[in-house]
Amino acid sequence: MQTLADLLNTIPAIDPAAMSRAQRHIDGLLKPVGSLGRLEALAIQLAGMPGLNGIPHVGKKAVLVMCADHGVWEEGVAISPKEVTAIQAENMTRGTTGVCVLAAQAGANVHVVDVGIDSAEPIPGLINMRVARGSGNIASAPAMSRRQAEKLLLDVICYTRELAKNGVTLFGVGELGMANTTPAAAIVSTITGRDPEEVVGIGANLPTDKLANKIDVVRRAITLNQPNPQDGIDVLAKVGGFDLVGIAGVMLGAASCGLPVLLDGFLSYAAALAACQMSPAIKPYLIPSHLSVEKGARIALSHLGLEPYLNMDMRLGEGSGAALAMPIIEAACAIYNNMGELAASNIVLPGNTTSDLNS
């Protein structure tokens, strides 16, 4: 069995030759050069991913939802009862939550993973990777040990790679956990170097009069735990949570197979920041779905160098944005594979210097 270090060191590089071929092919399609904008760039990005063998396409689709509770809930940083995590996880097994409906619309399977729900017994229908019944309270202790973080990362990476072996070529990430925007903000603040006040938002409708306490909790967590911003695992272990570790694991697992992974909202941006610290080579495999309205979203995305495809004023989480954006990926593949070519119609457009569309 490969170790975590082995997997982090074997992320395949994007294939520039495949991307160049894709660029020439797209420039020769029945349209003015560049007229499909970011859809063209997306198709070229996909062509460079080794797991797709140079041809943008979508096989099976999967959204992996990491579910966990957080000890920092005790600090009054969320208004929802902690029990809602377990209740909503069970609802996901029935297909009635937002991500389940949107994933079904997109033709994607939802994998609901218990990585740290605070319930006495495992919840039927969930994939059980539970590390503990919730993470530590980051305002007074680390979220988890480094060993716990590394083991969960490896477990999720292996699960993701197994899905890829079974035909999944497009992954989406999601999460579920009351109070989880607090550790996410702590991660974003730590890695970007921005003050907590700049990145802490209202999460799931936290009253504005409670926002100062949430900012203070994040600041205390960082001061107490002293996470190393250059060490993604250290950041996740000290001020993160099991759901955030799980999301990072999906990203690393998909990238290790040379396959794309759709980000969701603020939680996924935070996990991506940590994952990119572990292995910068995964960045070209990350596709941003939508711009979360959570306060620190733009700061995190700017640090990642990513521009979302959608701006829908969404902040549900769960993987809802990732599921919603899956048809955009399929559209990029469709134009690449199904549009006709200028040469076949004897059309010559000014500025089109494509000489060999199939080279």
UniProtKB/Swiss-Prot annotation:
An example Gene Ontology molecular-function term: nicotinate-nucleotide-dimethylbenzimidazole phosphoribosyltransferase activity
Domain of life: Bacteria
KW Glycosyltransferase (keyword) present: yes
Alphabetical UniProt keywords: Cobalamin biosynthesis, Glycosyltransferase, Transferase
Alphabetized InterPro entries for the sequence: Nict_dMeBzImd_PRibTrfase (IPR003200), Nict_dMeBzImd_PRibTrfase_bact (IPR017846), Nict_dMeBzImd_PRibTrfase_N (IPR023195), Nict_dMeBzImd_PRibTrfase_sf (IPR036087)
Pfam families: DBI_PRT (PF02277)
Keyword hit for ATP-binding: no
Family as reported in the entry's similarity comment: Belongs to the CobT family.
The protein's assembly and partners: Homodimer.
Summary of the function given for this chain in its UniProt record: Catalyzes the synthesis of alpha-ribazole-5'-phosphate from nicotinate mononucleotide (NAMN) and 5,6-dimethylbenzimidazole (DMB).
Full protein name: Nicotinate-nucleotide--dimethylbenzimidazole phosphoribosyltransferase
Organism this protein belongs to: Escherichia coli O9:H4 (strain HS)
